[in-house]
């Protein structure tokens, strides 16, 4: 699972989900990518589940890149606890994904295999996404 080794502050404010992604909007490593169309918090478990779904479908053929990292803690108070008494303890680590962000990339496989693997991964994620292809001008 993806978890930060060390953080300066154990609890953080919730990151805003409005607006478009400013960086990481093009396919930069692989040939195909999954691009988010809606904003969402993607947890480390969802990222790992999507990665496993893709790699199992691709088998040994290609390479998968993960372009997001869950670096924000989300807290939760215990069940049946009265309001007040401070902020709850960290429960999950999330990546704040904005529309336009490329989440995963794949290379080394045919387009049909890549599209099928990525559609399986999209079903594991809590957002709407599309599959994009690398353009000639991209670095």
Swiss-Prot record:
Residues 1-25 are annotated as: Disordered. One of its GO terms (cellular component) is cytosolic large ribosomal subunit. Residues 1-16 have a biased composition (Basic residues). Pfam families: Ribosomal_L16 (PF00252). One of its GO terms (biological process) is translation. The keyword rRNA-binding applies. One of its GO terms (molecular function) is tRNA binding. PROSITE patterns: RIBOSOMAL_L16_1, RIBOSOMAL_L16_2. Belongs to the universal ribosomal protein uL16 family. Binds 23S rRNA and is also seen to make contacts with the A and possibly P site tRNAs. This is Large ribosomal subunit protein uL16. It comes from Leifsonia xyli subsp. xyli (strain CTCB07).
